C-alpha cells in the first residue's frame, strides 16, 4: 500500500473563492477595476512580510503566449477560463507548484492548493494560511448570515471546493464504474473528467468534489469528501484484487502490451497515451511492473500538447507532437535510473 493512498488518489485540491468588497464581480467589472484587484493581490502576497512573499512568481495572461497559458492549464495551475482572460487575467503561483492564486477568473480571487495523494487536511491548512494572509490587507465581500459572496450561487457560503483526483481502472474494467459514480452523484458530489467541468475522464481518471458550499463548515465539507474518497479507494482496491485473482494471465498480458507500446511506439496521440498509461499504472500498483509511479504521473503532465512543445522548445503540429510524444515517453520509460 502506497503512502497517502497514491495508488488510487493522484491528488487532493482545496480551492477557495473570494471577492473584494465594493468591487463588482469579474463578469461585470471594468478593466480598471480588474487592474485594481491585481494590485491588491500583489500587495497582499508579494508585499507581505513573510517568507511566502519570496516563494511566488506572477503571471499576467496578456504577457504569456497561448502555449504558456495552455501549459499552466495542463498542470492544473490555472483554469481554462482564466487562460482566456487576456485583459485582466493574472495568477500568483508558488514556486513548488502546490499553490496558485487565480485573479479575475469567475471570482476576484481563487486560492488553490494541490498536493499529491490523499492530503485534503494539509491542502486546507495551506489554503487557509494564504487566505488569512490575504485577508490582512483585503476586505472580502462577506455577509454575516450567508458567508462569502461569490459570482456563482453554488460557491456562496464557505466558498470552498474540495476535490480528489482518482484513478479507477479496475472499476472501469469490471463494469462497476457507472454504479459507483451514480452513487457519488446522488449524495451531492460532482464527478468530472481530468480537467474539470465538461471534460472527459481520460485514462480512467475522475475528479470528485463537493457541489454546494452553503450550510456546512469547511471541516464538514472536507470530511465528507475524504469519507467518499476512502470508500472509492476501498472499492477500487477490492476490484483490483478480484480482477487479478480471477484473470491473472489476461491482466498481465494487458499490462505487458500497454507497456510494450508505450515504451516502443513511434507515433502516439494524447488519447492513446492516456489509455495505455491507465493499464501501465494498474500494472505498477499490482506489482507486475517495476516502474516508478511518481515518474509515470509526472510523465502524464509532460506529454500533454503544450508542455511537450515547451520541453522540445518548438511549435509542433499535431502529427509532429504525436511523433515527439512517442519519442519522449520511450526515452523516459527506457531510461535506467
Swiss-Prot record:
The biological process GO terms on file are: phosphocreatine biosynthetic process
Q: Which residues bind ATP?
A: 11-15, 76, 110, 161-165, 192-197
Name the EC number(s).
2.7.14.1
Provide the catalytic activity annotation.
Answer: L-arginyl-[protein] + ATP = N(omega)-phospho-L-arginyl-[protein] + ADP + H(+)
Give the matching Gene3D superfamilies: Glutamine synthetase/guanido kinase, catalytic domain
Keywords carried by this UniProt record? Allosteric enzyme, ATP-binding, Kinase, Nucleotide-binding, Transferase
* Record GO cellular component, one term: extracellular space
What enzyme category does the UniProt record give? transferase
Membrane-spanning residues where?
none
Activity modulation notes: Appears to be allosterically activated by the binding of pArg-containing polypeptides to the pArg-binding pocket localized in the C-terminal domain of McsB.
The answer to whether keyword Transferase applies is yes
Which Pfam families would you find in this protein's record? ATP-gua_Ptrans (PF00217)
**PROSITE patterns, per database record:** PHOSPHAGEN_KINASE (PS00112), PHOSPHAGEN_KINASE_C (PS51510)
Residue intervals of the Phosphagen kinase C-terminal domain:
8-239
Motif (RDXXRA motif of the pArg binding pocket involved in allosteric regulation) positions are: 321-326
* SUPFAM superfamilies, per the entry: Glutamine synthetase/guanido kinase (SSF55931)
Question: What terms describe the molecular function in GO for this protein?
Answer: ATP binding; creatine kinase activity; protein kinase activity
Q: Record's InterPro entries?
A: Arg_Kinase, ATP-guanido_PTrfase, ATP-guanido_PTrfase_AS, ATP-guanido_PTrfase_cat, Gln_synth/guanido_kin_cat_dom
What's the family? Belongs to the ATP:guanido phosphotransferase family.
Functional note: Catalyzes the specific phosphorylation of arginine residues in proteins.
HAMAP family recorded: Prot_Arg_kinase
Instruction: Tell me what this protein is called.
Output: Protein-arginine kinase
Species of origin reads Caldanaerobacter subterraneus subsp. tengcongensis (strain DSM 15242 / JCM 11007 / NBRC 100824 / MB4) (Thermoanaerobacter tengcongensis)
Kindly list the organism's lineage. Answer: Bacteria, Bacillati, Bacillota, Clostridia, Thermoanaerobacterales
Q: State the gene name recorded for this protein.
A: mcsB
